[in-house]
């Protein structure tokens, strides 16, 4: 009996020890709820760039190259047509005094005192003066045209607005389908090297940004242009291309919107004429090379077709025929 009690007591003690051990074990803590996921912040849009300042007409310097003998037949037409709508932009560079022209153009008629003979030296002399006057003006764009060009000032402004004047921009139309070569010479005539480059023909017009024009200064300013042209024996428009491409490594941007008398102007689609930047005509030597446009003037009344183009662009001009103006169509 005593043995049975002893065994029972031992069993009770063992059970009590086991219960005590269980009570001493750490109880598991309740798991904290997972934090709710917050959506990642949406990426910030880049700050909007301020709109580029719009180009104003007086940001552009249009240089018209002419000669004394053309003041009557050619310049009178330009003054009556496109220059009348772009007076603040246009500067006329000639080679002789003309009180009547100066009365119309004021200080925007510049006598270059260059020779009136059409030689390489005379052409480069005028371009040199054009360049210096542009730099002096502080304007953003330089555009050169001849006195047989019609300039659509609105199309020109629209085209230039696509570019920054601080970048290297040389816009125009080459008259050749390949680059030309120039042989660089040093004093004494020793050949140095041959350079290939494109150039925009002056007869169609071309434009330079101020940023690029300033880089041209060592070879173009204060008479240096004439020295550079003489070094490579090239005329004015070719020398511009030589400086830009051959010396500075910039590139001509070919534009189909510039036109000279060297191309077949009758092939221009009539419905695109009012979008072109410059137009031209064949002159007395090639009177049939004109744009194909209908208007209130016959070919006899308007042999260059400049008046017809002008009245389509500016039908409010007081001398334009008082009729309904439509899109350009073939004659």
UniProtKB/Swiss-Prot annotation:
Entry keyword set: Developmental protein, Differentiation, Disulfide bond, Glycoprotein, Glycosyltransferase, Golgi apparatus, Manganese, Membrane, Metal-binding, Neurogenesis, Signal-anchor, Transferase, Transmembrane, Transmembrane helix
Q: List the disulfide bonds.
A: 114-125, 143-207, 311-320
User: One GO molecular function term?
Assistant: metal ion binding
Membrane disposition? Single-pass type II membrane protein
Q: Which residue ranges does the entry give as Cytoplasmic-facing topology? A: 1-6
Is the keyword ATP-binding in the record?
no
GO cellular component, as recorded = extracellular region; Golgi membrane
Q: Which reaction does it catalyse?
A: 3-O-(alpha-L-fucosyl)-L-threonyl-[EGF-like domain protein] + UDP-N-acetyl-alpha-D-glucosamine = 3-O-(N-acetyl-beta-D-glucosaminyl-(1->3)-alpha-L-fucosyl)-L-threonyl-[EGF-like domain protein] + UDP + H(+); 3-O-(alpha-L-fucosyl)-L-seryl-[EGF-like domain protein] + UDP-N-acetyl-alpha-D-glucosamine = 3-O-(N-acetyl-beta-D-glucosaminyl-(1->3)-alpha-L-fucosyl)-L-seryl-[EGF-like domain protein] + UDP + H(+)
Residues annotated for substrate binding in this entry = 74, 147
Give the enzyme's EC designation.
2.4.1.222
Residues the entry annotates as binding Mn(2+): 148, 261
Sites carrying a glycan are 113
KW Nucleus (keyword) present: no
The protein's required cofactor(s) are namely: Mn(2+)
Q: Where is the composition biased (Pro residues)?
A: 34-50
UniProt lists the family membership as follows: Belongs to the glycosyltransferase 31 family.
Describe the function of this protein: Glycosyltransferase that initiates the elongation of O-linked fucose residues attached to EGF-like repeats in the extracellular domain of Notch molecules. Modulates NOTCH1 activity by modifying O-fucose residues at specific EGF-like domains resulting in enhancement of NOTCH1 activation by DLL1 and JAG1. May be involved in limb formation and in neurogenesis.
The name under which this protein is listed is Beta-1,3-N-acetylglucosaminyltransferase radical fringe
Organism equals Homo sapiens (Human)
